């Protein structure tokens, strides 16, 4: 009774509809708790009946449904349930919540209904109640259209079909904007363990009908009219069938249900007549409410059986009245409330945490509560009588039973679990009641109510008691109570329910309202998109349910129902509950999911069945029923609920990635991170242990401190094979650190890094923890013989005179060498020594200077020494063993092996030496670079000495060539400069008289017809009738362009176009090439001025002209080289006497020797010619000269 009073107080607080939402949360929690206690008494049942008006439902329907958002009816519902469910006081929280919801509808009708609302805590806005009152006429008319459309169908529905229809209606209501009504329905009225099972059954069948008529809003009626919807039938058909079988009144209950449903449907479809009839049959809402209230005070005390007959009477009244009362909110609300109260007394608390305790019907009831369409009517229209009696009957009795089943489904869902937990206490009494009819009716009634317009969490909170108290009904109601079906978007089923006849009409007539910001939306997609801004549920209902479960862990927990219902108000203030939005991830839109059978009865509902694993086994019966679950948020735990949702999303989005590098964190020796010294994080060295500040150091001053080693910045034991990965700490003395097996993941030893004086001046006092040691790692200088060098004492400077110089004097310049004439003569000598005329390859200028030193400056004596093959030096001579570069002799076999090794291993002289074997690596290197220097073929640019680009290439090939050359113009210019720089700067050698080249007659002088084209390649002479044929033939010769001239026979002078030329130059210079085909347009022709070749692009001709310049340059260089070679040969012949004669070069003939730089122009041909000349003169060993095959080694791009 105290609880009832609290509920009454809550109801009174919520009596003002404005306060209804804020206070209902508190009231719901308290009411739920008290309802469990009072529900046993049974007085709570009467109170719920008394409240005829539900702010969320039209007054007619709301009267039938006791769904006060606040705690108005909670007290009465709870009282009745407490009376009946004394054993289920703890788990009866859910039942009480349901009862409270039904009572709230009764409470809405009158302040006397405040007691029922107390038992029934559900949050709703006053506006919703006002709307429900205002909707009495308008909504009834709206419902008329629905009733007219679906009247026949509703009449055709049997008791089982009625249950299914109720469930369908609840599902439709979930999908429709009246989701709040469904939620209210889902909030099964707390039914005390029915003292008399038959009375409960009688009441139950009556209640389902009036509950359906009164409890269901237009969407609910529509659902009822659509009994054919399979998903709505799920477990309800069986429960309805079972209702008559289970009790002595089961047959009557189904009949009454069918009749009552038909009446309700008729009344709903024919609101005016029904209202009149309701007015005739009904007792004024206030009277009915007062009666339930009066009954409730007495009923809470009397046993549930006494309350049940009263409730049966009230239900009978309401059964007759509710049929017409669908549009008459107050009478219907009163009857429905009374019937629901009676049902609650008759029906044991069906809300159990245990999934087994919850029958599928109960789970369906919960599913029906989320009806989105009902929410708008629930709020806007005066269908409260209808929704309220329907809610009371179906919600109280059926909702309890359905909660048993739904709670099974919800058991998987945390929200459902919370409801089940609260209903779990009531649930056992229901099972104990064992009234099949009542359970079936409860299932049927709960089917509709379990499609709560309010969030399932909120509805179940009211009925569920302490657990759902956490999920304050206000929290649910704010979601559900709003005229819009936003609360239902929170429930997947309501959103998932087909909008067909119901959803569309509901959406059209009722706007979806955001439960958080109260904004209205015309359709669910808009609402879903808006809900994302608040953080919506996951797109898929299953995901939402899972999230809801995670968000509301207390709800899914089945153990919660067994404990006594926690006081709902303490969990959250009514304002907080009313303001608590549904926890919905932003990424998940709220959708009305079509009901579909699933192992998780509330799988669709986010709150009821987030996951099958969370559901109790008994909830599996509800799998068939599609349940719209709105995550029930324990308002205090809402943020935590959101976190689980995020974690689930993160887990699903998680991609397997390789584990990151594990670097052990630095020792956490400083609890205050701000106090830690500045600078990089340091680790203990694994090679040397830092100086340990231990007592043993103070006691043993002789103990030598270990050397200071700067601590590493990276952990030496970090994962991976590092330099110190296998190093163990070596102990130093008894106080040394124990050795640790350093595995890749072994953290750095817990050593405290102390710094008595840090750079920033902050001194940190370090206190070692258990197992830690203080280590002084302050930078210091290691002192000792091992770390400091021994510096000798300063000596007298006079000691320098006694030191003897250990170097050998090799060269000392004389003052006479400063003479310019003498310098010139020395330069000439060095130039000769750098030529091939002297042994050593002409590169041994060092030997020349040594010889000149020995000759005391006499150039002629030095030159004579140089010309000797084997200079004899005494063993005592300081340079007796001195090796001069280029002085080694290489045999023919060695040169061949060297060439082969060089071609195989390039400049890897170690492998070259292994192949040559007779020479050292140093000799191989010296031989290579010596001859590279002599031959001057190691240039960076490409050499084109004997390669002449084919002038007869096709225009496309020339274009390609042009592009390539255009890409490397700078390279060409650089190479040209290099060539010029390498060309001897000394004056050109005097022209050597050579045989004038015999110029062959022009091609046309050969008697060939002018229209024929002859190939001028050597040993060829093929004649072609067209230039294209000749060009094609020229490709056969490819890069084998051979120079027709004899070596050294071509003068340095530039050849004229008319003269014989190499390659195809003569062909191009012939008149035939200068003529063009008559078909060619002269404006698009670009002929070559040199050879007459015609091009169709100026770029092609420009590229072609480069070939002429290159050919000319190459020919000029060849001529110069040949002339120089001939000059050198003639000079050597003149300067050398007869074989074996020791003659010396006259001093006046030194000017004839070309300076060393002139050697740059030497090539293979010159070297070979010089080799032949020198062989004849027997001046130098030819072993130092390269053979023809050796010259290949020194060509190409090799660099010095």
From Swiss-Prot:
GO terms for biological process: cellular response to progesterone stimulus; negative regulation of DNA-templated transcription; positive regulation of DNA-templated transcription; positive regulation of transcription by RNA polymerase II; progesterone receptor signaling pathway; regulation of transcription by RNA polymerase II. Residues 439-1200 are annotated as: Interaction with CREBBP. Highest expression was seen in thymus, testis and adrenal cortex, expressed also in the adrenal medulla, thyroid, and stomach. Highly expressed in steroidogenic JEG-3 and MCF-7 cells, low expression was seen in non-steroidogenic Hep-G2 and HEK293 cells. Residues 779-870 form the ELM2 domain. Residues 954-970 have a biased composition (Acidic residues). Residues 192-223, 256-320, 333-354, 391-503, 529-577, 595-622, 650-670, 954-1009, 1036-1081 are annotated as: Disordered. Residues 407-420, 439-448, 464-473, 599-608 have a biased composition (Polar residues). Residues 885-936 form the SANT domain. Its main location: nucleus. Residues 259-281, 288-298, 307-320, 333-349, 1066-1080 have a biased composition (Low complexity). The modification N6-acetyllysine is found at residues 633, 640. Coiled coil: none annotated. Pfam families: ELM2 (PF01448), zf-C2H2_6 (PF13912). Residues 553-573, 661-670 have a biased composition (Pro residues). It comes from the Eukaryota. One of its GO terms (cellular component) is fibrillar center. It is found in: Nucleus. Keywords: Acetylation, Activator, DNA-binding, Metal-binding, Nucleus, Phosphoprotein, Repeat, Transcription, Transcription regulation, Zinc, Zinc-finger. The modification Phosphothreonine is found at residues 767, 954. A zinc finger (C2H2-type) spans 512-534, 1013-1037, 1086-1108. Binds DNA and activates transcription of CYP11A1. Interaction with CREBBP and EP300 results in a synergistic transcriptional activation of CYP11A1. This is Transcriptional-regulating factor 1.
């Amino acid at each position: 009774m105290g609880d009832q009073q609290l509920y009454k107080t809550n109801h009174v607080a919520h009596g003002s509809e404005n306060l209804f939402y804020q206070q209902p949360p508190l009231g719901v929690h308290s009411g739920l708790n008290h309802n469990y206690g009072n529900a046993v008494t049974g007085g709570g049942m009467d109170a719920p009946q008394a409240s005829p008006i539900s702010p969320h439902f039209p007054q007619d329907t709301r009267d039938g449904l006791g769904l006060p958002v606040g705690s108005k009816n909670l007290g009465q519902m709870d009282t009745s349930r407490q009376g009946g469910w004394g054993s289920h006081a703890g788990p009866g929280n859910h039942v009480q919540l349901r009862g409270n919801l039904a009572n709230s509808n009764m409470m809405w009708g009158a302040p006397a209904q405040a007691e029922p609302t107390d038992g029934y805590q559900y949050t709703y806005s006053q506006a919703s109640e006002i709307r429900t009152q205002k909707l009495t006429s308008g909504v009834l008319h709206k419902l008329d259209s629905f009733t007219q459309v679906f009247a026949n169908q509703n009449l055709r529905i049997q008791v089982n079909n009625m249950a299914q229809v109720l469930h369908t209606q609840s599902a439709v209501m979930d999908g429709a904007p009246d989701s709040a009504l469904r939620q209210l329905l889902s909030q099964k009225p707390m039914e005390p363990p029915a003292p008399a099972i038959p009375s409960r059954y009688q009441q139950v069948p009556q209640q389902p009908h009036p509950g359906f008529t009164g409890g269901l809003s237009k969407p609910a009626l529509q659902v009822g009219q659509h009994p054919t919807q399979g998903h709505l039938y799920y477990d309800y058909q069986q429960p309805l069938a079972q209702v008559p079988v289970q009790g002595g009144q089961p047959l009557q209950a189904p009949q009454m249900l069918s009749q009552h449903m038909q009446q309700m449907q008729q009344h709903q479809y024919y609101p005016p007549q029904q209202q009149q009839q309701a007015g005739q049959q009904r007792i004024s809402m206030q009277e009915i409410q007062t009666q339930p209230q009066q009954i409730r005070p007495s009923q809470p005390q009397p046993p549930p059986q006494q309350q049940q007959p009263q409730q049966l009477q009230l239900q009978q009244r309401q059964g007759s009245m509710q049929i017409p009362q669908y549009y008459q909110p107050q009478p219907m609300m009163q009857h429905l409330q009374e019937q629901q109260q009676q049902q609650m007394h008759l029906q044991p608390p069906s809300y159990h945490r245990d999934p087994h305790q919850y029958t599928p019907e109960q789970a369906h009831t919960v599913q029906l509560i989320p009806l989105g369409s009902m929410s708008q009517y629930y709020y806007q229209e005066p269908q409260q009588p209808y929704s309220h009696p329907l809610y009371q009957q179906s919600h109280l009795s059926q909702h309890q039973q359905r909660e048993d089943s739904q709670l099974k489904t919800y058991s998987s869902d945390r929200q459902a679990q919370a409801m089940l937990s609260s209903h779990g206490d009531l649930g056992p009494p229901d099972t104990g009641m064992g009234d099949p009819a009542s359970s079936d009716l409860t299932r049927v009634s709960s089917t509709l109510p379990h499609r709560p317009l309010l969030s399932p969490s909120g509805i179940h909170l009211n009925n569920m008691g302490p657990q759902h108290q956490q999920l304050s009904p206000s929290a649910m109601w704010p979601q559900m109570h709003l005229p819009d079906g936003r609360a239902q978007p929170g429930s997947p089923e309501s959103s998932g329910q087909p909008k067909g006849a119901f959803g569309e009409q509901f959406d059209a007539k009722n706007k979806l309202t955001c439960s958080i910001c109260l904004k209205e939306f015309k359709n669910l997609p808009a609402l879903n998109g808006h809900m994302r801004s608040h953080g919506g549920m996951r797109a898929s209902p299953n995901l939402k349910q899972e999230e809801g479960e995670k968000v509301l862990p207390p709800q899914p927990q089945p153990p919660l129902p067994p404990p006594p219902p926690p006081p709902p108000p303490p969990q959250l203030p009514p304002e907080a509950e009313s303001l608590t939005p549904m926890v919905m991830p932003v990424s998940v839109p709220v959708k009305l999911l079509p009901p579909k059978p699933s192992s998780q009865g509330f799988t669709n509902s986010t709150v009821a069945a987030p996951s099958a694993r969370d559901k109790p086994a008994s909830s599996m019966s509800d799998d068939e029923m599609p349940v719209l679950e709105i995550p029930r948020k324990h308002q205090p735990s809402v943020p935590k609920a959101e976190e689980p949702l995020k974690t689930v999303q993160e887990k699903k989005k998680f991609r397997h990635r390789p584990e990151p590098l594990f670097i052990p964190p630095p020792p956490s020796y400083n609890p205050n991170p701000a106090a830690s010294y500045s600078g990089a994080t340091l680790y203990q060295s694994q090679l040397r242990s830092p100086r340990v500040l231990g007592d043993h150091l103070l006691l043993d001053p002789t103990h030598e401190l270990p050397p200071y080693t700067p601590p590493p910045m990276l952990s030496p034991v970090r994962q991976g094979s590092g330099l110190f990965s296998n190093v163990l700490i070596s102990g130093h003395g008894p106080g040394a650190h124990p050795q640790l097996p350093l595995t890749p993941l072994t953290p750095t030893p817990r050593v405290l890094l102390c710094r008595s004086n840090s750079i920033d001046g902050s001194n940190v006092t370090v206190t070692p923890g258990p197992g830690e040691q203080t280590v002084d790692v302050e930078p210091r200088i290691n002192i000792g013989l091992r770390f400091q060098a021994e510096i000798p004492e300063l000596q007298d400077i006079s000691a320098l005179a006694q030191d003897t110089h250990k170097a050998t004097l090799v060269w000392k310049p004389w003052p006479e060498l400063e003479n310019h004439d003498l310098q010139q003569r020395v330069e000439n000598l060095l130039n000769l020594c750098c030529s091939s005329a002297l042994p050593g390859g002409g590169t041994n200028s060092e030997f020349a200077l040594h010889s000149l030193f020995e000759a005391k400056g006499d150039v002629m004596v030095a030159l004579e020494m140089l010309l000797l093959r084997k200079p004899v030096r005494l063993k005592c001579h300081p340079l007796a063993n001195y090796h001069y570069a280029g002085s080694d002799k290489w045999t023919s076999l060695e040169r061949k092996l060297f060439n082969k090794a060089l071609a195989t291993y390039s400049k890897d002289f170690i492998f070259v030496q292994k192949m040559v074997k007779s020479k050292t690596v140093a000799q191989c290197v010296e031989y290579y670079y010596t001859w590279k220097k002599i031959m001057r073929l190691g240039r960076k640019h490409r050499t084109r000495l004997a390669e002449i680009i084919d002038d007869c290439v096709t225009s496309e090939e020339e274009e390609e060539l042009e592009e390539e050359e255009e890409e490397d113009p700078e390279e060409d210019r650089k190479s040209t400069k290099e060539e010029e720089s390498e060309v001897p700067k000394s004056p050109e050698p005097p022209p050597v008289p050579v045989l004038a080249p015999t110029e062959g007659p022009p091609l046309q002088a050969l008697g060939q017809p002018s229209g024929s084209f002859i190939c001028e390649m050597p040993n060829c002479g093929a004649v072609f009738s067209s230039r294209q044929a000749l060009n094609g033939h020229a490709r056969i010769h490819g890069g084998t362009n051979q120079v027709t001239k004899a070596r050294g026979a071509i003068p340095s002078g530039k050849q004229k176009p008319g003269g014989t030329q190499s390659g195809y130059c003569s062909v191009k210079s012939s008149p035939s090439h200068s003529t063009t085909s008559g078909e060619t347009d002269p404006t698009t022709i670009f002929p070559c001025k040199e050879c007459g070749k015609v091009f169709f692009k100026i770029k092609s001709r420009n590229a072609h002209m480069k070939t002429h310049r290159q050919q000319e340059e190459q020919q000029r260089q060849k001529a110069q080289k040949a002339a120089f070679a001939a000059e050198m040969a003639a000079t050597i012949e003149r300067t050398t006497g007869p074989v074996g004669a020791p003659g010396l070069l006259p001093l006046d003939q030194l000017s004839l020797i070309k300076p060393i730089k002139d050697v740059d122009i030497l090539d293979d041909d010159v070297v070979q010619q010089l080799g032949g000349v020198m062989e004849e003169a027997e001046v130098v060993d030819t072993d130092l000269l390269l053979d023809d095959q050796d010259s290949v080694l020194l060509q190409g791009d090799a660099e010095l």
